[in-house]
Amino acid sequence: MIAPGPRATDHDTDVLVVGAGPVGLTLANILGLQGIRTVVVEERDTLIDYPRGVGLDDEALRTFQSIGLVERVLPHTVPNQILRFMDAKRRVLAEMAPPDARFGWPKRNGFVQPLVDAELLAGLDRFAHVQVRWGSPMTGCREDADGVNVELGADGGNVGDGGGDGHPARLRARYVVGCDGGRSMTRRVMGVSFDGTTSSTRWLVVDIANDPLGHPNSEVGADPERPYASISIAHGIRRFEFMIHADESDEQAEDPEFLTRMLARMVPHPDRVDVIRRRVYTHHSRIAGEFRRGRLLLAGDAAHLMPVWQGQGYNSGIRDAANLGWKLAAVVSGRAGDKLLDTYDMERRKHARAMIDLSTMVGRVISPTNRRVAGARDLLVRSASIVPTLKRYVLEMRFKPMPRYEQGAVVHANPGRADSPVGTLFIQPRVDTRDQQDVLLDDVLGPWFAVLCWNNNPRKILGETAFANWKALGARFFALRPATQLHWTGHDDPDVVVVGDRRGDLKSWFDTHAESVLFLRPDRCIAGACIAQRAPDLSAALFDALTLTPRGGDPQSGTGSVLYVAQPAPESSGAVAGPA
């Protein structure tokens, strides 16, 4: 750690993000859209140019939609990708092909991570108040009551004191978020544990251009002789993964002849493939003891590591950014108290732990090398697939843990109710307004808080005081109606947007819930829900629980009044090869 310096009352930046990987870049885009001064520091000189993650889920795409970049990301994806689990004879044991898109996007998508990460980086060009500093490792930091003094390695850039001339640079930030991977320097500085296990099993991972198979889907081979995976990414790239046996060394596995033998099971000409990259790796199942300590926080691999079998490492990190980003923006802009940041650990830890456990369990199911154990597993899986409900359970990925916050930045009017929608993500159907037709709901709601009422005017339901408080916070208001009532003007209000239920999805949602008034957080989690008559009381409870301040804004920040930077019209762009 660096020695304590004089306490300053000003800050070089509001938030310092350590690490320019997908989590750090997503977080910086969220903060950028909210007008928060942000500096991203990265020890590398450029983005990592090889794939690591290979699957995006619907929640990640919804987050990219929220930062105005989904149209740039989509060209690098394979939507609705099917995953098949095969036995030793390459017969299908189980299949995952979830059909619904309740959050607006397909649940399974292959993608090319370097190209998607490059789009996230290019998105930061929209914000003069967001900077990226390459070749700038964080070497230490010290927190005081008002901020964090951070020391960067030589050539640490030109923000703050020093840097750019071979000497260490110092920056002062209100908060520091470590998105710096499994070997996180931020986590070490915080002094928190990283408990869990590292598997003794090793895998050879090979990325190949000009896909020798060419089909759009993926398979996992639960072959006791040698478990494997074959994954279609996008743009003609395929990943193969092969288990390395205990009596095989890393050197053997990295020999081209070894790869040729492995690929011979999959393609007719294994010696005629274009290898992009190969490496040997192991799986980790670990989680940090704390995601927050004072003004330092962790996200992504710095906070948790999980095996690859559910493709949730990348997506879990994007969930972290979506959960933390709006909370940091609210606190830094003076619209919420610092205690709101405590809810980040409360909400994300349980779900991250569930994803780690699921990924670890799936790895154990597919990778036994004992033939009797594998045979018993195959029999059990096939027997289960005969039962329609069990088959749908796997096919539709119903086993995937969904975020459901029982405590945190939520208010449960009836904590014991298992069917309460509070703490879950709201659906995202396609809707109509009087100005737009057939648009995704989030594009209507905007990037901040939203108050939704079915068949009612939010102002009348909330009352003038509560309505004014939400309006001062920057929230928007929506009256949800059947499409037949979209153009009826009898209850028009200049502060309320009328939304037409284009396909009946909204009514179907309200059909299954008693609540008719919803308070949505910026990450589209339902913070509170109630019947219309209880709305004023729930509104007051939410302001208290989330420590919200209607007319917030820190005069020292210079960003307190900025809650939304208008986005350009969505447009697809070509691949971005490196940092802008």
UniProtKB/Swiss-Prot annotation:
Broad EC category: oxidoreductase
SUPFAM superfamilies: FAD/NAD(P)-binding domain
Known catalytic reactions: 3-(3-hydroxyphenyl)propanoate + NADH + O2 + H(+) = 3-(2,3-dihydroxyphenyl)propanoate + NAD(+) + H2O; (2E)-3-(3-hydroxyphenyl)prop-2-enoate + NADH + O2 + H(+) = (2E)-3-(2,3-dihydroxyphenyl)prop-2-enoate + NAD(+) + H2O
Swiss-Prot/TrEMBL cofactor(s): FAD
GO annotation terms (biological process): 3-(3-hydroxy)phenylpropionate catabolic process; 3-phenylpropionate catabolic process
Binding site for FAD: 14-43, 291-301
Gene Ontology MF terms: 3-(3-hydroxyphenyl)propionate hydroxylase activity; FAD binding
This protein's record includes keyword Iron: no
InterPro entries: 3-HPP/3HCI_hydroxylase, FAD-bd, FAD/NAD-bd_sf, PheA/TfdB_FAD_monoxygenase
Pfam families: FAD_binding_3
Pathway linked to the protein: Aromatic compound metabolism; 3-phenylpropanoate degradation
Keyword line: Aromatic hydrocarbons catabolism, FAD, Flavoprotein, NAD, Oxidoreductase
EC number(s) given by UniProt: 1.14.13.127
Family: Belongs to the PheA/TfdB FAD monooxygenase family.
Functional description taken from the UniProt entry: Catalyzes the insertion of one atom of molecular oxygen into position 2 of the phenyl ring of 3-(3-hydroxyphenyl)propionate (3-HPP) and hydroxycinnamic acid (3HCI).
PANTHER family (alphabetical): 3-(3-HYDROXY-PHENYL)PROPIONATE/3-HYDROXYCINNAMIC ACID HYDROXYLASE (PTHR43476), FAD-BINDING MONOOXYGENASE (PTHR43476:SF3)
Identification of the protein by name: 3-(3-hydroxy-phenyl)propionate/3-hydroxycinnamic acid hydroxylase
The species this protein was found in: Mycolicibacterium paratuberculosis (strain ATCC BAA-968 / K-10)
Organism lineage string: Bacteria, Bacillati, Actinomycetota, Actinomycetes, Mycobacteriales
